[in-house]
Amino acid sequence: MSAAISRNWPAPAKLNLFLHINGRRTDGYHELQTLFQFIDYCDMLDFKVTDSSELILHSNMAGVVADSDNLILRAAKSLQQMTSFKGGAEIWLDKRLPMGGGLGGGSSDAATTLVALNTLWNTQLSTEELAKIGLKLGADIPVFIHGFAAFAEGIGERLQVVSPPEPWYLVIAPDAHVSTAEVFQDPLLPRNTPKLAIDTLMSQAWINDCQKLVVSKYPQVAKALGWLLEYAPSRMTGTGACVFGEFTQQQQALAALAKLPSDMQGFVAKGMNISPLITRLNHP
């Protein structure tokens, strides 16, 4: 008998509420301190367990990323191999998050795949075991698997649960694809921000060490940030290109969105300290 499709597994976006680069390691990775918070704007995935070991992905972004590079398929394959699960899955992705925008969409898709298939395949790995699989695929996948707003250190893998305010955000996605690798390789990137205690970081003004460099190289990011700063305290997330402004009320964010210039795209979303994925997992 054919298995039913398990629907509406969310893969939420994240924002880096601050991002400090503390140094570069001998292996080329950067030491950082950052604060992750989720927003209620998500890709959505559906899953169907199959008897065959084949992994099939259907996506409204078909052809953009080769199957061998697709984090969803790599995550599913890694879980198969780790657990020796003999079956497979058919996966449907409804891609809503901008690609390459600093919102973590690809990592979130991979995390949701690991969490959902661990449940649907009944492979019974712990959250920590899933996070270890995820870390091999991407440094920010573990925070999506754990599903709680977190202060992160190291290359982003050492997590401490925190509960920052949950404002409304207006997120603008400039028409620019910023290469994370190029940003971190740029000699002008600040790499010497002192490491600070979490209490100090949580109480001071929040900045993104990548922002000045990206704004100088990408006029679209500079324009979006300049516009948004007229309405609210605003910063870039990750290495960009997306920027976000903080509002205390949804109506304030929607009013600003209504004035968004026609050459920009944006959306309003709520900050969330508990990921929608955790809610979905606990309410199958």
Swiss-Prot record:
<dbReference type="InterPro" id="IPR020568">
    <property type="entry name" value="Ribosomal_Su5_D2-typ_SF"/>
</dbReference>
<feature type="active site">
    <location>
        <position position="140"/>
    </location>
</feature>
<dbReference type="InterPro" id="IPR036554">
    <property type="entry name" value="GHMP_kinase_C_sf"/>
</dbReference>
<dbReference type="InterPro" id="IPR006204">
    <property type="entry name" value="GHMP_kinase_N_dom"/>
</dbReference>
<dbReference type="GO" id="GO:0005524">
    <property type="term" value="F:ATP binding"/>
</dbReference>
<comment type="similarity">
    <text>Belongs to the GHMP kinase family. IspE subfamily.</text>
</comment>
<protein>
    <recommendedName>
        <fullName>4-diphosphocytidyl-2-C-methyl-D-erythritol kinase</fullName>
        <ecNumber>2.7.1.148</ecNumber>
    </recommendedName>
</protein>
<dbReference type="Pfam" id="PF00288">
    <property type="entry name" value="GHMP_kinases_N"/>
</dbReference>
<dbReference type="GO" id="GO:0019288">
    <property type="term" value="P:isopentenyl diphosphate biosynthetic process, methylerythritol 4-phosphate pathway"/>
</dbReference>
<comment type="pathway">
    <text>Isoprenoid biosynthesis; isopentenyl diphosphate biosynthesis via DXP pathway; isopentenyl diphosphate from 1-deoxy-D-xylulose 5-phosphate: step 3/6.</text>
</comment>
<keyword id="KW-0418">Kinase</keyword>
<dbReference type="InterPro" id="IPR004424">
    <property type="entry name" value="IspE"/>
</dbReference>
<dbReference type="InterPro" id="IPR013750">
    <property type="entry name" value="GHMP_kinase_C_dom"/>
</dbReference>
<dbReference type="InterPro" id="IPR014721">
    <property type="entry name" value="Ribsml_uS5_D2-typ_fold_subgr"/>
</dbReference>
<keyword id="KW-0547">Nucleotide-binding</keyword>
<dbReference type="Pfam" id="PF08544">
    <property type="entry name" value="GHMP_kinases_C"/>
</dbReference>
<keyword id="KW-0414">Isoprene biosynthesis</keyword>
<feature type="active site">
    <location>
        <position position="14"/>
    </location>
</feature>
<feature type="binding site">
    <location>
        <begin position="98"/>
        <end position="108"/>
    </location>
    <ligand>
        <name>ATP</name>
    </ligand>
</feature>
<dbReference type="GO" id="GO:0050515">
    <property type="term" value="F:4-(cytidine 5'-diphospho)-2-C-methyl-D-erythritol kinase activity"/>
</dbReference>
<keyword id="KW-0067">ATP-binding</keyword>
<comment type="function">
    <text>Catalyzes the phosphorylation of the position 2 hydroxy group of 4-diphosphocytidyl-2C-methyl-D-erythritol.</text>
</comment>
<dbReference type="GO" id="GO:0016114">
    <property type="term" value="P:terpenoid biosynthetic process"/>
</dbReference>
<keyword id="KW-0808">Transferase</keyword>
